[in-house]
Amino acid sequence: MKKMIFMAAALAMSMGAYAQGGNTRMGGSDGDIQSIAERVTNIEKKNDAFNVYFNYAASAQAEHNSLSGDWTTKIANKQFRLEIKGNLTDKLYYRLRHRMNKATDAKGEDNFAKATDIMMVGYNFNDKLSLSAGKMCQIWGGFEFDENPMYIYQYSDMVDNMDNFMAGVVLSYKPIASQEIAVEISNANNGKFVDEYGSGATVVSKEGKVEALEQAKNPLTYIVNWNGSFFNGLLNTRWAWGIQTQAKHKYSRMLTLGQQLNLPKFQWYFDYMGAFDDLDRLKIASSEFSAAGFADNAGDNAYLGKVHYNSFITKANWQFAPSWNLMVKGMYETASVSKIEKLKDYRKSYGYMGSLEYYP
């Protein structure tokens, strides 16, 4: 299916959106951007202990479905987030990010709502070593993954289907200022096993073979991450490898390789993301094909197994004039169920888009 999306109008309002930055850890430096508290009260900022940011984005969209030939239109709220963060001392810091347009019921595993992206505290032991704990964005590499959602018109299928705000602990070590190695242990899911997969869940890894899924005793995620910067920040990398415990003896392994060219008026990145799932974590393949159709007695809550996803993402920004930015983005993605002949390399999708942006 080919789907075209036209942004007839887009509105993005933020107080300190650039300072809010990305998803992982503190989301970037505040730089010289004022917090909303300063702007509203006109009080000079004396310290960095309390900063409040509101981020809002909405758009009017026209979509074309090439299969049916139908055009549809809508006006939609994309993002409405409140963020509070700060440095209580030169060593102790915190961050809260909460979405106003997501479910607020607490999940069974971590007791956080889906609406709460981040609620964490951290401690800098010194310039090289830090520890963060709480609910955070998992430290998968790649630049689309960590980009401020305010600036994403359409995510890749892979990132759009990832569930990555989890309770956990991150230990970060910087042997030199431009290089960081981080390790993370977090929950694999927000909810209990039965909440994620349903009662009596099964997996179909190959035709005719059904396995009952059992809850793992330690449903955790383990990630190793490298963030590198070279040539005074002109070339940056965000690479990661991790394994997630889906169920008993069922794991999801993921590799991410992100590279960025960062020039004064031109920025370009290229990401590769690959997922190798014993149990379909992204659930793209399982939503497009009924696993029960490939094995008898699979039950109502059946998922595909041995699923492999690839995602290639590239994006460029060019600030060709003051207050103006030209953005182009392309995506190519594949999906394959390796043990079911009919579903080997069954899915190839691509997307491309561009925008002309004005920042008053």
What are these regions (language model features)?
Residues 4-11, 18-59:
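N-terminal periplasmic/intermembrane-space "pro-region" immediately following the signal or transit peptide
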Residues 34, 38, 78-82, 116-121, ...:
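Hydrophobic, lipid-facing positions within transmembrane beta-strands of outer-membrane proteins
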Residues 40-64, 69-191, 228-233:
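Outer membrane beta-barrel
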Residues 47-49, 219, 224-339, 346, ...:
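Detector for outer-membrane/organellar transmembrane beta-barrel domains
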Residues 54-58, 96, 133, 171, ...:
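Membrane-embedded beta-strand positions of outer-membrane beta-barrel proteins
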Residues 64-71, 75, 104-115, 144-150, ...:
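Outer-membrane beta-barrel translocator domains and adjoining extracellular loop/strand segments
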Residues 189-191, 250-251, 306, 358-359:
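Outer-membrane beta-barrel porins/channels
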Residues 190-192, 198-201, 209-220, 228-230:
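Solenoidal tandem-repeat scaffolds enriched in leucines and small polar residues
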